[in-house]
Each structure stands twice: as C-alpha cells, then as structure tokens.
C-alpha cells in the first residue's frame, strides 16, 4: 500500500501539470471503488485547479467549487498522460484538462477512492480526526509523549495509528523502530522521553529520505511518471525476516502484530 512518501511523491509529480489548469471533463469508467465515485461532472467541469495538497495518505485537488479527495488504496496510481493515450485495464477515472492532458487513475484492486467535498476538508469525516503530519513541527516529542501516556498497546501499533500521527504505515514503522532501537512490541506508555525523542527524529528522517528516493516500490507503486521508487534498496528490516541484521549480524525475527508483518532485530531493538 502506498504510504506517506509514495503519496507525497505522487503529489509532487502531478501538481505542476494540474495547478491553474481548467477541467473540461471527468470520465468515470468504473465507479465501484472502495466507496462509490460520486457523479461530480457538473460541479467540476469548467473549474480551475488551484492547488494539489496532501493530508495523511489523501491527495486533495482543490477548485473554487470544492475538493476532490483521492486515495490510492492498495494498488492505485495517478499519471499525467496525453489525452489520446489508449485506455488500459483498470484505468477507472480520467480528469481531462483543457491543456490536452489527463490525470488518469488506475487501480487494479479497486481499494482506492475518489470523493468530493464542498466543505473545508478538515470537516470531512475521513479527515476530521487525523493526527499531525509527521514532517511538520506539530509532530514532536511532547505531542507523542502525551498521545502515548498510559497506553499499553505495542509502540508499532501506536505509530501506525492515524489519530496519533498520520501516514506512518507498515514499511516506515518497521524502519523507524529499528533505527531508534525500540522493540515493536514495547509498551508505548512506558517508553521514556529520551527514546521517544530519538524515535520522532528517525520517523522524520526516514520519511524525508524516502520522499527524496521517490518512495518505496515493492509491487504496485510507481511514480506519476511511471518510474519506480528506490527506497526499497535502503530497507534494513521490512521484508527481510530471517535475513541478517545490517547492524549486528543477528537473524531478524518476523512476527504478526496487529495483523501486519513485523520484522525486527531482537538484539538491536529492546523493550
């Protein structure tokens, strides 16, 4: 599933081609995504795209009439293409622009979403209760310590909780905990402030580096230009269960935590 870096890379790739462009059509070939795609052609045709933003793993395409809320789901991608590009399997939606280009949404598994919001986006049910963005000052050790106070849940589950901090999915939670030397099953509320300080710094550094590398391509993700992300070449633990630790040489352990595969080093990462 595309995580925050992959969504941000997509935003950076499509924004220069969308901002200040006029929408001339919205073609919906298959509206049966995670939620039914609303018929918003009347609202969006003729509108000028003002900006393309990201909130958590959602892309927000703003016009004066409202905002398209796009989620890539498990396997979705957005690409800027010439308007006459042949339609391929799983090309479900085209946002057609007056400049002869289209924004094409492809999603083989159809767990993605394309929704519409005429309210301020912070009022939308999907966005209203989200936690802070990890690459902003709002995500800091004081905020994290307060959010974790008294929690008995495993720290990895808390790190992936969008009410605590957004956009840190399975890949980057594994990597950040390894870099911080924290066992993924450590009780969140008992981690001291010094270790939380390191964890916050590692989350920020790893996400920022992943964005610079174009995200992580494991199976489905490609950038807006169709190229893969290269952060997979930098992974220390994710997807490496049973292999040797890059730090100490110990065999990495693999468990299921919150129904997600979790990989860690039992020597380098402590509770």
Curated annotation (Swiss-Prot):
Q: Does the keyword DNA damage apply?
A: yes
Q: Which SUPFAM superfamilies does UniProt cross-reference here?
A: Glucocorticoid receptor-like (DNA-binding domain) (SSF57716), N-terminal domain of MutM-like DNA repair proteins (SSF81624), S13-like H2TH domain (SSF46946)
Query: What UniProt keywords apply to this chain's record, in alphabetical order?
Result: DNA damage, DNA repair, DNA-binding, Glycosidase, Hydrolase, Lyase, Metal-binding, Multifunctional enzyme, Zinc, Zinc-finger
The catalytic site is made up of 2-3, 57, 260
- In the record, what terms sit under GO molecular function? 8-oxo-7,8-dihydroguanine DNA N-glycosylase activity; class I DNA-(apurinic or apyrimidinic site) endonuclease activity; damaged DNA binding; zinc ion binding
Domain of life, per lineage:
Bacteria
In this chain, the FPG-type zinc fingers fall at: 236-270
Q: Which reaction does it catalyse?
A: Hydrolysis of DNA containing ring-opened 7-methylguanine residues, releasing 2,6-diamino-4-hydroxy-5-(N-methyl)formamidopyrimidine; 2'-deoxyribonucleotide-(2'-deoxyribose 5'-phosphate)-2'-deoxyribonucleotide-DNA = a 3'-end 2'-deoxyribonucleotide-(2,3-dehydro-2,3-deoxyribose 5'-phosphate)-DNA + a 5'-end 5'-phospho-2'-deoxyribonucleoside-DNA + H(+)
So which cofactors does this thing need? Answer: Zn(2+)
Detail which positions bind DNA: 90, 109, 151
The family classification in the record reads: Belongs to the FPG family.
Say what the protein does: Involved in base excision repair of DNA damaged by oxidation or by mutagenic agents. Acts as a DNA glycosylase that recognizes and removes damaged bases. Has a preference for oxidized purines, such as 7,8-dihydro-8-oxoguanine (8-oxoG). Has AP (apurinic/apyrimidinic) lyase activity and introduces nicks in the DNA strand. Cleaves the DNA backbone by beta-delta elimination to generate a single-strand break at the site of the removed base with both 3'- and 5'-phosphates.
Q: How does it assemble?
A: Monomer.
Q: Can you say what this protein is called? A: Formamidopyrimidine-DNA glycosylase
Gene name as annotated: mutM
């Amino acid at each position: 599933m595309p995580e925050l870096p992959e969504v941000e890379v997509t935003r950076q790739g499509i924004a220069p081609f969308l901002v200040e462009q006029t929408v001339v059509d919205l073609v919906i070939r298959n509206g049966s995504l995670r939620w039914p795609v609303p018929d918003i052609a009347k609202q969006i045709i003729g509108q000028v795209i003002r900006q393309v933003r990201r909130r958590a793993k959602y892309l927000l395409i703003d016009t004066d009439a409202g905002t398209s809320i796009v989620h890539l789901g498990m396997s979705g991608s957005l690409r800027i293409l010439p308007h006459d590009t042949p339609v391929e399997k799983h090309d479900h939606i085209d946002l057609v622009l007056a400049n002869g280009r289209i924004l094409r949404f492809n999603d083989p598994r159809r767990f993605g979403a394309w929704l519409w919001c005429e309210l301020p986006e912070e009022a939308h049910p999907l966005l209203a209760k989200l936690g802070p963005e990890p690459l902003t000052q709002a995500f800091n050790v004081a905020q994290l310590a307060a959010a974790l106070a008294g929690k008995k849940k495993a720290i990895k589950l808390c790190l992936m909780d969008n009410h605590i901090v957004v956009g840190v999915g399975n890949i980057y939670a594994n990597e950040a905990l390894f870099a911080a030397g924290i066992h993924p099953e450590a009780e969140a509320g008992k981690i001291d402030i010094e270790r939380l300080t390191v964890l916050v710094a590692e989350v920020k550094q790893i996400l920022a580096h992943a964005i610079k590398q174009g995200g992580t391509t494991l199976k489905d993700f490609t950038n807006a230009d169709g190229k893969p992300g290269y952060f997979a070449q930098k992974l220390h633990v994710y997807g490496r269960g049973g292999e040797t630790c890059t730090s100490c040489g110990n065999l990495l352990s693999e468990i299921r935590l919150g129904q997600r595969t979790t990989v860690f080093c039992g020597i380098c990462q402590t509770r």
